[in-house]
From Swiss-Prot:
Keywords: Electron transport, Heme, Iron, Membrane, Metal-binding, Photosynthesis, Photosystem II, Thylakoid, Transmembrane, Transmembrane helix, Transport. This is Cytochrome b559 subunit alpha. The gene is psbE. Heterodimer of an alpha subunit and a beta subunit. PSII is composed of 1 copy each of membrane proteins PsbA, PsbB, PsbC, PsbD, PsbE, PsbF, PsbH, PsbI, PsbJ, PsbK, PsbL, PsbM, PsbT, PsbX, PsbY, PsbZ, Psb30/Ycf12, peripheral proteins PsbO, CyanoQ (PsbQ), PsbU, PsbV and a large number of cofactors. It forms dimeric complexes. Gene3D superfamilies: Photosystem II cytochrome b559, alpha subunit (1.20.5.860).
């Protein structure tokens, strides 16, 4: 070994009581926050994806497939009408 960086060894960290007290709270909170982010629909708003009931309208039930990449903008505008 060429020297020490001054950091605590990983084994000491994961066997400490303080580590488990902190992480027993923060890890479940991350899962709960993610679940709330998705279940409230905020994820759809943040990332701009349509909600499951917005993919197809009553007027348009076919798949919106783009056929010509040079006319893609016009085709997308037609799909959104």
């Amino acid at each position: 070994m060429s020297g020490s960086t001054g950091e605590r060894p990983f084994g000491d960290i994961v066997t400490s009581i303080r580590y488990w007290i902190i992480h027993s709270i923060t890890i479940p909170m991350l899962f709960i926050a993610g679940w709330l982010f998705v279940s409230t629909g905020l994820a759809y708003d943040v990332f701009g994806t349509p909600r499951p009931d917005e993919y197809y309208t009553q007027e348009r039930q076919e798949l919106p497939i783009i056929n010509d990449r040079f006319e893609a903008k016009n085709q997308i505008e037609q799909f959104n009408q």
